[in-house]
């Protein structure tokens, strides 16, 4: 990646958009300190970051309830879990088996899992992947609601401009590992 420069402030949604293979996920992983930059500097004013990856590998044959899934790799309590599920509109799924969830329900659970500890930066990598048209609209509305309610910055990674434009404050375009300047949307 070359030429990347953008900020994600509290209460702001910034979208990194570009075709497959243009380095969007790599950029996100550098911001999250999952990957190191070969050169240059990645800075963050917070360690309270959460990430919803583009793909998550789950053994769908394993009996796993939503409440148990929420606790994997994170020390959150039941109150945090129910509040996060309520924020994402799926509190009724608390004791449901994960393998029985629809694509949209599972995405909402993933987002709830990420926001349970109230991050200051939320990174969402292709959050509407595998969700139907109506579900996409609902998820983009949910993302805006989360930004407003938690006053957290959101970095939204996408390759689809359709609904992104209605919820984002800034758009940064990534193309063949070069990033164009951020576009401010008013």
Language-model segments: what does each one mean?
Residues 17-19:
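The feature captures the beta-strand-to-loop junction immediately N-terminal to the Walker
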Residues 78-95:
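Conserved ABC ATPase "signature" region
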């Amino acid at each position: 990646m070359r030429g990347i420069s953008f900020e994600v402030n509290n209460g702001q949604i910034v979208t990194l958009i570009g075709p497959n293979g243009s380095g969007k996920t790599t950029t996100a992983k550098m911001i999250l300190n999952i990957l190191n930059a070969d050169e240059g500097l990645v800075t963050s004013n917070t360690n309270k970051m959460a990430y919803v990856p583009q793909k998550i590998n789950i053994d769908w044959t394993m009996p796993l309830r939503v409440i148990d899934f929420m606790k994997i790799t994170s020390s959150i309590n039941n109150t945090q879990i129910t509040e996060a599920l309520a924020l994402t509109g799926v509190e009724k799924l608390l004791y449901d088996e994960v393998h029985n969830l629809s694509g949209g329900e599972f995405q909402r659970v993933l987002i709830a899992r990420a926001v349970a500890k109230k991050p200051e930066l939320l990174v969402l990598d292709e959050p509407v992947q595998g969700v139907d048209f109506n579900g996409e609209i609902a998820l983009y509305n949910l993302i805006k609601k989360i930004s407003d309610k938690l006053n957290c910055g959101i970095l939204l990674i996408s390759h689809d401009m359709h609904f992104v434009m209605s919820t984002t404050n800034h758009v940064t375009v990534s193309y063949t590992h070069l990033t164009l300047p951020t576009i401010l949307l008013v």
